[in-house]
């Protein structure tokens, strides 16, 4: 399994090198009782660009829907998550990223685009955001040797409790459209919540 994580780490690093972030990432490790370690890699470029926090460990095993009678231990979907935020690293964010990445192993959650992962607590110290909205990221899928499924790196956008309620009511795409209409920058940790009509 460590080989899988090594491949994922290398491919993610290649993505950021191509985008001008050549420094080795800082890494924080988080371990939850009864679960394997989750690393959170921090890729920071020069200037006022968003810092990317990428999980490493979720893709160690394929995700399994707990309602399935028979789970495929090889070909099930695999994922990692990436959070992009501007500014200094907020205290507690790495733990929240690790909570999402550990959710498939701990809670049987299958991470997928448009999924809402509600932690019901601030994602970092003093944050108004309590949930993540998952979507496709610009990081390419990491192809693994056959017969293993590729690893999808999903974007995880911090959202407020009000926005989470909106996603439950209207859907993920409606939330994204509201951000565009309201001129909301989802990478701004001090942004206001969108006010969908």
Task: Give, region by region, the residue ranges found by the protein language model.
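Acidic, proline/glycine-rich low-complexity IDRs
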Residues: 1-197
């Amino acid at each position: 399994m460590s080989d899988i994580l090594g491949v994922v780490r290398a491919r993610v690093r290649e993505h950021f090198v191509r985008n001008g972030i050549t420094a080795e990432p800082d890494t924080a490790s988080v371990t939850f009782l009864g679960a394997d370690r989750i690393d959170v890699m921090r890729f920071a470029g020069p200037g006022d660009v968003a810092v990317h926090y990428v999980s490493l460990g979720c893709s160690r095993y394929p995700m399994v829907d707990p309602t399935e009678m028979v789970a495929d231990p090889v070909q099930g979907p695999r994922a990692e998550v990436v959070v992009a935020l501007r500014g200094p690293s907020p205290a507690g964010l790495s733990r929240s990223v690790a909570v999402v990445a550990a959710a498939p192993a701990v809670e049987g959650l299958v991470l997928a685009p448009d999924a809402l992962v509600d932690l019901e607590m601030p994602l970092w110290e003093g944050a108004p955001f309590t949930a993540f909205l998952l979507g496709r990221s610009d990081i390419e899928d990491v192809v693994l040797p056959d017969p293993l499924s590729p690893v999808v790196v999903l974007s995880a956008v911090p959202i407020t409790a009000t926005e989470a309620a909106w996603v439950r009511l209207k859907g993920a795409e409606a939330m994204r459209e509201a951000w565009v209409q309201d001129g909301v920058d989802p990478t701004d940790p001090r942004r206001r919540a969108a006010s969908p009509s």
